[in-house]
């Protein structure tokens, strides 16, 4: 008998990958209606705590991959990177994308775009180049984790569970990370609230925009009320 809370796992579009330690990442793959082997791929990375099931979002002209990061403290997410400073979640995400491409029979030059919100925005920026994305849309992304006002307002324990107690600053602050990326960066679409949590806009999205300006990297910025 299927437990009701896990009933979504019986969906024929739902699959999983696992690593050598038995850690599993579940995902839903919704193929495009026409020519999925050549259709672009849209990878959706959810935010903190949105882990009850993969989104049912689909597009007729796009292949949609919707994984779940239910790792980290309380199973609410590990920022699409890992647990206690490892990179296990990041590696599983790469396996999800690779398995999806194999199932779709995707062409080698298939287009990949990533959308992520909040925690997912961090994950989209972090994993964009590694996954070969041409564009990343990050909605209200976290850029700096530990040491930010957002961290001190209640998120510190979740960040520590993902990054460890002595985090690598390359991954604690994506302003540092993006400067280490070799090769071409994706086109960044950044969306931020005009009025949000204290210091969030300036410490997060706007600090990243300053870094992109410094690096002379192209981007699109949208500030919404």
Model-derived segments and spans:
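Short, surface-exposed basic-aromatic patches at helix termini and helix-loop junctions that form
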Residues: 57-60, 127-134, 210-214
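Short loop/turn segments at strand-loop or loop-helix junctions that form parts
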Residues: 45-47, 66-72, 139-143, 191-195, ...
């Amino acid at each position: 008998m299927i437990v009701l809370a896990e009933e979504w796992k019986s969906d024929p579009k739902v699959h999983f990958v696992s690593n050598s330690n038995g850690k599993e990442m579940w995902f839903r793959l919704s193929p495009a209606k026409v020519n999925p082997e050549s259709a672009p791929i849209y990878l959706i990375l959810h935010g903190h705590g949105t882990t009850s099931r993969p989104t049912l979002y689909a597009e007729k002209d796009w292949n949609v991959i919707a994984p779940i990061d239910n790792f980290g403290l309380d199973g609410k997410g590990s920022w699409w990177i890992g647990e206690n400073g490892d990179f296990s979640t990041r590696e599983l995400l790469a396996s999800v994308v690779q398995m999806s491409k194999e199932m779709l029979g995707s062409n080698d030059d298939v287009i990949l775009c990533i959308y992520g919100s909040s925690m997912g925005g961090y994950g989209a920026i972090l994993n964009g180049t590694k996954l070969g994305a041409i564009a990343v849309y990050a909605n209200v992304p976290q850029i700096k984790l530990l040491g930010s006002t957002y961290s001190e307002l209640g998120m510190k324990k979740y960040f520590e569970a993902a990054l460890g107690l002595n985090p690598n600053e390359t991954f604690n602050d994506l302003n540092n990370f993006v400067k280490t990326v070799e090769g071409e960066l994706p086109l960044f679409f950044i969306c931020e609230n005009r009025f949000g949590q204290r210091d969030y806009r300036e410490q997060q999205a706007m600090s990243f925009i300053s870094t992109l300006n410094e690096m002379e990297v192209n981007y699109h910025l949208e500030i919404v009320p």
